[in-house]
Curated annotation (Swiss-Prot):
NCBIfam families per UniProt: helicase_HerA
Keywords, comma-separated and alphabetical: ATP-binding, DNA damage, DNA repair, DNA-binding, Helicase, Hydrolase, Isomerase, Nucleotide-binding
Protein's UniProt name: DNA double-strand break repair helicase HerA
Reaction catalyzed: Couples ATP hydrolysis with the unwinding of duplex DNA at the replication fork by translocating in the 5'-3' direction. This creates two antiparallel DNA single strands (ssDNA). The leading ssDNA polymer is the template for DNA polymerase III holoenzyme which synthesizes a continuous strand; ATP + H2O = ADP + phosphate + H(+); Couples ATP hydrolysis with the unwinding of duplex DNA by translocating in the 3'-5' direction
Domain of life: Archaea
Subunit structure: Homohexamer. Interacts with NurA.
Record-linked PANTHER family: HELICASE MJ1565-RELATED (PTHR42957:SF1)
Native source organism of the sequence: Pyrococcus furiosus (strain ATCC 43587 / DSM 3638 / JCM 8422 / Vc1)
Entry annotated with the keyword ATP-binding: yes
Reported function: Involved in DNA double-strand break (DSB) repair. Probably acts with NurA to stimulate resection of the 5' strand and produce the long 3' single-strand that is required for RadA loading. Has DNA-dependent ATPase activity and DNA helicase activity.
Regulation: Helicase activity is stimulated in the presence of NurA.
SUPFAM superfamilies (UniProt xref): P-loop containing nucleoside triphosphate hydrolases (SSF52540)
Length: 551
């Protein structure tokens, strides 16, 4: 047994108990302790409350004056009547290296001991990727089950500056360097473009510019991309006619060339005052007169397209973004040059393509294994071979981490990015597509998606609305654990869910202190050093004005 810390007293059940703390012991909030139930089985629990009681001063009728008189009267004997009492929440009964539900109450008078580091390590396990240590036990390493983390999805939630990006970087390191998995990070702010892994440096980091194949967009997606309001239905109608016509007549074009062809067609409509367009339904070209009041409508579309090309022409590509993903690496999609609406379009198309290719590959693989007909087996093998050739990373499971997930899947809003994220959350485990969502405002994140993130890494959250929202969306998160979250320090987290054997308060490793063959880990996302910047500006200004000031 470890250190003897107290004796069970008062009301005790199969879910909780109190114990009087040994005066020579040091017992903190969150400490792990063990005792025996009435059947003699070892029971593990955590200290949830610690209170100090003095029986000589505990009268409810006491006021300041009477307390002062009592202190003077009792003198040194006060200390002899003082007691520190701890309340314990029972986590379970220990069976081998597992915890099972405890269904037998604790007997008064049982001795309570601190749980040993070895016992805790055995329970938390030694398999998986290492993310940190128990907050109160730095020798107990916390590992996350990779299968559960990826296939059942996860969320990293916290206020700004609490350590979200650091936690994500530690997870990436574990999956890419330790396991050899493939990770994609959708990065709205460019926080990971300078990512450097401890063991391999930048060798396993693939930076991909967030661009989009214009030819893959439908009319509504194109309207969103170039900034036509969803309420501008007439503009969207004419854009739809023109877009379908241009794509039909110029099937070999892509990228900016296709947009230039679209501009040519719109200008032709204005100059001829006639709309000639392709009707997919009838399978032929049709024409109608362009009413004079609609000329300005079309000019508005032209203005939007030209402005888009001027400001964002560099995000248009004819290359396939999904084909750029490299297996066994962290692939950072840099979305920072885009505005939020454009990000949603790019992310929606990208995730849809990733998911569809994974579904196609896994369905072909399963049918190939079951099929007895050589002809059918050859067909399925051809599908797999084509994907392995064009999209080598998608022949294997993949994890997609969505930073600032509330941008792409906001509560109460419909968009393509949110719909495909929801589908991955529901069906991704069947096809080897894992989803990780990261957010500083969980209450703004789609509740259905958040609830399907079956492991939650929750750093400091102080907003009551965010706390209530996370609690509502988390079956594994108890109210008392939620109470811990507001008091967490930077880099400290509550981890609950299927990737960890039981909930834990964890000190997550500092990624920038993880040392390997390539040095220490690095990533962006730090706050700007405002004071240093201002001091530098002041020095430059003082020097230019030749003023004598001490710094």
């Amino acid at each position: 047994m470890e250190e003897f810390v107290g004796i069970v007293r008062g009301e005790a059940s199969f879910t909780s108990y109190e114990f009087s703390i040994n005066p020579s012991a040091n017992v903190s909030f969150g400490e792990f302790v063990v005792t025996k139930n009435r059947d003699g089985d070892l029971v593990l629990g955590t200290v949830r409350h610690v209170k100090n009681v003095n029986w000589l001063l505990s009268s409810v009728k006491s006021n300041f004056n009477s307390l002062a008189l009592d202190i003077e009267e009792y003198g040194e004997s006060l200390g002899e009547n003082e007691e520190v009492v701890a309340t314990v929440r029972i986590l379970g009964k220990i069976e081998g290296n597992e915890l099972v539900p405890n269904r037998v109450p604790i007997r008064n008078g049982e001795y309570v001991y601190k749980a040993s580091d070895d016992l805790l390590q055995m329970i938390y396990g030694n398999d998986g990727i290492e993310i940190g240590t128990l907050l109160l036990r730095p020798n107990v390493r916390i590992k996350l089950d990779v299968n559960e983390l990826v296939s059942r999805h996860f969320a990293v939630l916290a206020v700004t500056g609490a350590g979200k990006s650091n936690a994500v970087a530690v997870i990436i390191k574990g999956i890419v360097e330790d396991v050899g998995g493939t990770v994609v990070v959708l990065d709205p702010h460019g926080d990971y473009v300078n990512l450097r892994l401890p063991e391999t440096g930048i060798d396993l980091v693939n930076i991909i510019d967030g661009k989009i194949r214009i030819e893959d967009l439908d009319p509504e997606e194109l309207a969103d991309l170039i900034g036509i309001s969803s309420s501008a239905q007439i503009q969207r109608h004419f854009l739809s006619l023109a877009w379908e016509t241009v794509k039909h007549k110029n099937q070999s074009l892509g990228g900016e060339s296709l947009l230039e062809a679209l501009l040519d067609l719109l200008n032709e409509w204005i100059s001829r005052k006639t709309i000639k367009y392709w009707s997919e339904k009838e399978g032929r070209m049709k024409s109608e007169d362009l009413k004079s009041e609609r000329i300005e409508t079309i000019r508005g579309i032209i203005f939007r397209i030209r402005r888009f090309l001027r400001n964002y022409g560099n995000i248009v590509t004819s290359e396939n973004l999904v084909a750029a993903i490299k297996p066994g690496m962290v692939n950072v999609i840099d979305l920072s040059p885009l505005d939020e609406n454009q990000m949603k379009v790019v992310v929606g198309k990208f995730l849809e393509a990733v998911f569809e290719k994974r579904v196609e590959y896994e369905m072909a693989r399963k049918r190939f294994e079951k099929e007895t007909s050589k002809k059918k087996r050859d067909e399925y093998e051809e599908i797999m071979t084509e994907i392995e050739s064009k999209y080598p990373a998608l022949a294997y499971p993949i994890l997609v981490i969505v930073e600032e997930a509330h941008i792409f899947a906001p509560q109460g809003e419909e968009n393509d990015a949110m719909r495909i994220m929801g589908r991955i959350a529901r069906e991704g485990r069947k096809f080897g597509v894992g989803l990780g969502v990261v957010s500083q405002r969980p209450s703004k994140l789609n509740e259905d998606i958040l609830s399907q993130m079956n492991t939650k890494i929750i750093l400091r959250i102080v907003n009551p609305r965010d706390q209530d929202y996370v609690l509502k969306a988390s079956e594994q998160l108890s109210k008392d654990l939620m109470d811990d979250i507001a008091g967490l320090g930077k880099g400290e987290a509550v981890i609950v869910g299927q990737a960890i054997k039981l909930p834990a308060l964890v000190r997550i490793y500092n990624f920038k202190e993880l040392r390997g063959k390539a040095g220490t880990g690095q990533y962006g996302g730090e706050d700007i050093g405002i004071l240093d910047r201002w001091n530098k500006m002041k020095r430059n200004m003082v020097n230019s004005l030749d003023i004598d000031i001490d710094f």
